[in-house]
Swiss-Prot record:
It comes from Salmonella typhi. The gene is wcdA. Keywords: Capsule biogenesis/degradation, NAD, Oxidoreductase. Homotrimer. GO terms for biological process: capsule polysaccharide biosynthetic process. It catalyses: UDP-N-acetyl-alpha-D-glucosamine + 2 NAD(+) + H2O = UDP-2-acetamido-2-deoxy-alpha-D-glucuronate + 2 NADH + 3 H(+). This is UDP-N-acetyl-D-glucosamine 6-dehydrogenase. Optimum pH is 7.2. The active site is at C261. It is an enzyme of class 1 (oxidoreductase). Belongs to the UDP-glucose/GDP-mannose dehydrogenase family. SUPFAM superfamilies: 6-phosphogluconate dehydrogenase C-terminal domain-like (SSF48179), NAD(P)-binding Rossmann-fold domains (SSF51735), UDP-glucose/GDP-mannose dehydrogenase C-terminal domain (SSF52413).
Length: 425
């Protein structure tokens, strides 16, 4: 086994997780950043991160980092970190395609003694049961004799400028005690918050998947509370504010649960659970409730429009925001699409305005073309769907200026004071 000074790192996948890793390692040691997306590589070489997770200055500081889409350029590396997405399919089952392809790619360049670390969120057992056999088959080598693996789950929070890679504690693990120690030592070089060496790869995998499952369930609880309080004509935000006066009340807010983690990861755990004969009722109940919130929001809006005497069929609706969270360009698994589709069933004409998104990416992924400018006095209903700073700065007067004389303003994200909107979650 090689020592810490002999580690030659390749980061496989340069998205929200991989790029920050590559940049931090690249500030102090030779690193190759690999991605199959040639456009992405060209942008990064020009100092541009369209995800806005890394600044041009930070890219310049990573003077030992090289970007490539050529497999040959990673052959000399011996420490591979795989950071590809792990989505779900239309049946809400794990889609391991990116992980499988990345494992096949790395397997073709593995040499004896090499280490492969996975950061992608998976179910417990996936690394050793799914990925290791691929590495062994592609390389023709024996696991834990010729090559080794580890698991260190990503904890990146897209758009968060306070909690970043280096100041979030990192869980590490390895397939042998010696390998676990080396992997931990490698990450300690860039993680100022420190590391936590888990007892096994499965423990590390399970720890990651329950982080987001716990959060998903807490949001499901407040979503259900919001539905109850709306029927009781009680303002949900006011209730949460009052309850939050106790020190141990958890400050979760209701809303649409999208993105690449919280709305996806629980399905990885439930998939594994059902595979071993246990039906996880609470986790799946929470997922069902959160998955249906788009329909609930749409129904709330329609009822408010009818109450105001607005003809729903053929009405114009403006949705402010399309990303899955505020102040971030990430549109992966955004559940605002559920609202768009549901309103379409009522023959509403929906416009999307979001200054953070790449319009072409939205068109390609969702078949929607966002508007670049918003018409004044045009809409029968307006939904503030994402709490972007730009929308907060507008205030209710400017936002209502997009509406007709008679319209409904739905503040989904508590951007405005309660009395300034017609409907709130």
């Amino acid at each position: 086994m090689f020592g810490i000074d002999e580690v030659k790192i390749a980061i496989i996948g340069l998205g929200y997780v991989g790029l920050p890793l590559a940049v931090e390692f690249g500030k102090s040691r030779q690193v190759v950043g690999f991605d199959v997306n040639k456009k992405r590589i060209l942008e990064l070489k020009n100092g541009v991160d369209v995800n806005l997770e890394t600044t041009e200055e930070e890219l310049r500081e990573a003077r030992y980092l090289k970007f490539t889409s050529e497999i040959e350029k990673i052959k000399e590396c011996n420490f591979y970190i795989i950071t590809v997405p792990t989505p779900i399919n239309t049946y809400k089952q794990p889609d391991l395609t990116p992980l499988i392809k990345a494992s096949e790619t790395v397997g073709t360049v593995l040499n004896r003694g090499d280490i492969v670390v996975y950061e992608s969120t998976v179910y417990p057992g996936c690394t050793e049961e799914e990925c290791v056999p691929i590495l062994a088959r592609m390389s023709g080598m024996t696991f834990n004799q010729d090559f080794y693996v580890g698991y260190s789950p990503e904890r990146i929070n897209p758009g968060d400028k306070k909690h970043r890679l280096t100041n979030i504690k990192k869980i590490t693990s390895g397939s042998t005690a010696q390998i676990a120690e080396l992997i931990d030592e490698v990450y300690q070089q860039i993680i100022s918050a420190g590391t936590y060496k888990a007892e096994s790869i499965k423990v590390a995998e399970a720890a990651k998947v329950i982080e987001n499952t716990q959060r998903d369930l807490n949001i499901a609880l407040v979503n259900e509370l919001a539905i109850i309080f709306n029927r009781l004509n009680i303002d949900t935000e006011a209730v949460l504010r009052a309850a939050g006066s106790k020190w141990n009340f958890l400050p979760f807010r209701p809303g649409l649960v999208g993105g690449h983690c919280i709305g996806v990861d629980p399905y990885y755990l439930t998939h594994k659970s059902q595979g071993i004969g246990y039906y996880p009722e609470i986790i799946l109940a929470g997922r069902r409730l959160n998955d249906n919130m788009g329909n609930y929001v749409s129904e709330q809006l329609i009822k408010a429009m009818i109450k105001k005497g607005i003809n729903v069929e053929g009405s114009s609706v403006l949705i402010l925001g399309f990303t899955f969270k505020e102040n971030c360009p990430d549109i992966r698994n955004t559940r605002i699409i559920d609202v768009v589709k549901e309103l379409g069933k009522y023959s509403c004409k929906v416009d999307i305005f979001d200054p953070w998104v790449d319009a072409e990416e939205v068109r390609r992924e969702y078949g929607i073309i966002p508007v670049s400018e918003v018409k004044s006095s045009h809409y029968d209903a307006i939904i503030v769907a994402v709490g972007h700073q730009q929308f907060k700065q507008m205030g209710s007067e400017d936002i209502r200026g997009f509406g007709k004389d008679k319209h409904v303003l739905y503040d989904l994200k508590y951007v405005l004071p309660a009395e300034q909107s017609d409907v709130r979650l």
